[in-house]
Amino acid sequence: MKFKTFSKSAVLLTASLAVLAACGSKNTASSPDYKLEGVTFPLQEKKTLKFMTASSPLSPKDPNEKLILQRLEKETGVHIDWTNYQSDFAEKRNLDISSGDLPDAIHNDGASDVDLMNWAKKGVIIPVEDLIDKYMPNLKKILDEKPEYKALMTAPDGHIYSFPWIEELGDGKESIHSVNDMAWINKDWLKKLGLEMPKTTDDLIKVLEAFKNGDPNGNGEADEIPFSFISGNGNEDFKFLFAAFGIGDNDDHLVVGNDGKVDFTADNDNYKEGVKFIRQLQEKGLIDKEAFEHDWNSYIAKGHDQKFGVYFTWDKNNVTGSNESYDVLPVLAGPSGQKHVARTNGMGFARDKMVITSVNKNLELTAKWIDAQYAPLQSVQNNWGTYGDDKQQNIFELDQASNSLKHLPLNGTAPAELRQKTEVGGPLAILDSYYGKVTTMPDDAKWRLDLIKEYYVPYMSNVNNYPRVFMTQEDLDKIAHIEADMNDYIYRKRAEWIVNGNIDTEWDDYKKELEKYGLSDYLAIKQKYYDQYQANKN
């Protein structure tokens, strides 16, 4: 990890020297100074800005072939000359930066917090908070109404260096991100075997045993897989079930108590009880034999064949298809009778969607073009796609009377694939207040939100989750170093205990090892930034 960090720093140092060396020379990747003031759209005379971007291989090589950008050019009078990379973006972006021939801005920049702080320190990008106040009324309005986003955008040095992507789909406990590893159960098998939906962890064991031994698919073969998952930090892990035994677990192994204390989840006794429960399933032969080895493709292949009794994923349509054979597994009561759901720390926010470089000579024009992306109707299209495209399937239809967008039926088309062909991405904001006024909510999101509200929200006790705080480079390096070793150790030991047992005899040594990796320092840093975020968002 230290070697990788050093290498990245070296590349960025080279980049900064190249940028400085390029000062005073002709920069063909950026635009000339148009000397514009008091910019209003559309411009009387078309001007060109030069941006670098990343896009999906499914989308056109020239982003200007997208109808969204064609309309935007007409509305603003600004032509964008794109350098568009559809693969290996970070590597190509860094090479361009190191050449010193910078564009006016980098769109969909994909920058880590370390990148942003390095670029700022070396003079590759500029702070933008003054531009927001002076030239960007759409974004400023959002930040005034939602100060928590401004707190998340602000770097430890007090500056804002990048423009965010914001996608609200539900708020607080009712956010679409509150649960990722949703558990799904084969209700056709329940019906075939005359079983009721399980209500407790003990019930689940009995149901899974029946799935194993009762030939619920009726083919006369013992080919059913009672319980399957993909182990790790995805949306297909079983850790969701651990909440039946206490505070539960999530991908970060981090929850925020209602007293504001940041708690680690993978070192307490109820985590141990959760592991022991999954160990029971292993001992009874109920777990997919390939569960700790298979990849996404083999997982969905089994899902499409409907071999699973219980499995985990964000949306069942991705694994077992759009049928009624599977339903949500309700929150299960544990041995104490407790029902609990541990929230994830996911949220619809990313601060790395656009930066303005230090060679940009048209700051007002650039800022106002970016601000146009934060207009509600524009943000919705940039995020999901557009309407009125004669060349391909549309995401929306435009209601001209209300000037709002309505999602069209997908008719079997994969939503992610269609969106990648038409969306623009980049800096945007979609607030919950837009639904029903500016746009309808995507059907798949509405369906999932309804499930979360019905099945999970009543059992969420934690008011807050851990936000995407902006740390100093020093603390980022510390966290990255600790997480790299500690998280690998946590998942390795969990798998060993499930397959081989011995958690009780090894538990104390496990906790000592977590301390050696730096758990106490890790929690102290996390707590410090959580407290700062709470103070700054108000």
UniProtKB/Swiss-Prot annotation:
<feature type="binding site">
    <location>
        <position position="419"/>
    </location>
    <ligand>
        <name>substrate</name>
    </ligand>
</feature>
<dbReference type="GO" id="GO:0046872">
    <property type="term" value="F:metal ion binding"/>
</dbReference>
<feature type="binding site">
    <location>
        <position position="219"/>
    </location>
    <ligand>
        <name>Ca(2+) 1</name>
    </ligand>
</feature>
<dbReference type="GO" id="GO:0015774">
    <property type="term" value="P:polysaccharide transport"/>
</dbReference>
<comment type="function">
    <text>Part of the ABC transporter complex FusABC-MsmK involved in short- and long-chain fructooligosaccharide (FOS) import. Required for the utilization of long-chain FOSs. Binds kestose, nystose, fructofuranosyl-nystose and inulin, but not sucrose. Has a preference for long-chain FOSs (tetrasaccharides and larger).</text>
</comment>
<feature type="binding site">
    <location>
        <position position="224"/>
    </location>
    <ligand>
        <name>Ca(2+) 1</name>
    </ligand>
</feature>
<keyword id="KW-0762">Sugar transport</keyword>
<feature type="binding site">
    <location>
        <position position="318"/>
    </location>
    <ligand>
        <name>substrate</name>
    </ligand>
</feature>
<keyword id="KW-1003">Cell membrane</keyword>
<dbReference type="InterPro" id="IPR050490">
    <property type="entry name" value="Bact_solute-bd_prot1"/>
</dbReference>
<keyword id="KW-0472">Membrane</keyword>
<feature type="binding site">
    <location>
        <position position="267"/>
    </location>
    <ligand>
        <name>Ca(2+) 2</name>
    </ligand>
</feature>
<feature type="binding site">
    <location>
        <position position="263"/>
    </location>
    <ligand>
        <name>Ca(2+) 2</name>
    </ligand>
</feature>
<feature type="binding site">
    <location>
        <position position="384"/>
    </location>
    <ligand>
        <name>substrate</name>
    </ligand>
</feature>
<keyword id="KW-0479">Metal-binding</keyword>
<keyword id="KW-0813">Transport</keyword>
<feature type="binding site">
    <location>
        <position position="423"/>
    </location>
    <ligand>
        <name>substrate</name>
    </ligand>
</feature>
<keyword id="KW-0449">Lipoprotein</keyword>
<keyword id="KW-0625">Polysaccharide transport</keyword>
<feature type="binding site">
    <location>
        <position position="314"/>
    </location>
    <ligand>
        <name>substrate</name>
    </ligand>
</feature>
<keyword id="KW-0564">Palmitate</keyword>
<feature type="binding site">
    <location>
        <position position="235"/>
    </location>
    <ligand>
        <name>substrate</name>
    </ligand>
</feature>
<dbReference type="GO" id="GO:0005886">
    <property type="term" value="C:plasma membrane"/>
</dbReference>
<feature type="binding site">
    <location>
        <position position="264"/>
    </location>
    <ligand>
        <name>Ca(2+) 2</name>
    </ligand>
</feature>
<protein>
    <recommendedName>
        <fullName>Fructooligosaccharide ABC transporter substrate-binding protein FusA</fullName>
    </recommendedName>
</protein>
<feature type="binding site">
    <location>
        <position position="223"/>
    </location>
    <ligand>
        <name>Ca(2+) 1</name>
    </ligand>
</feature>
<keyword id="KW-0732">Signal</keyword>
<feature type="lipid moiety-binding region" description="N-palmitoyl cysteine">
    <location>
        <position position="23"/>
    </location>
</feature>
<feature type="binding site">
    <location>
        <position position="268"/>
    </location>
    <ligand>
        <name>Ca(2+) 2</name>
    </ligand>
</feature>
<feature type="binding site">
    <location>
        <position position="167"/>
    </location>
    <ligand>
        <name>substrate</name>
    </ligand>
</feature>
<feature type="binding site">
    <location>
        <position position="353"/>
    </location>
    <ligand>
        <name>substrate</name>
    </ligand>
</feature>
<feature type="signal peptide">
    <location>
        <begin position="1"/>
        <end position="22"/>
    </location>
</feature>
<keyword id="KW-0106">Calcium</keyword>
<feature type="lipid moiety-binding region" description="S-diacylglycerol cysteine">
    <location>
        <position position="23"/>
    </location>
</feature>
<feature type="binding site">
    <location>
        <position position="221"/>
    </location>
    <ligand>
        <name>Ca(2+) 1</name>
    </ligand>
</feature>
<comment type="subunit">
    <text>The complex is composed of two ATP-binding proteins (MsmK), two transmembrane proteins (FusB and FusC) and a solute-binding protein (FusA).</text>
</comment>
<comment type="similarity">
    <text>Belongs to the bacterial solute-binding protein 1 family.</text>
</comment>
<feature type="binding site">
    <location>
        <position position="217"/>
    </location>
    <ligand>
        <name>Ca(2+) 1</name>
    </ligand>
</feature>
<feature type="binding site">
    <location>
        <position position="215"/>
    </location>
    <ligand>
        <name>Ca(2+) 1</name>
    </ligand>
</feature>
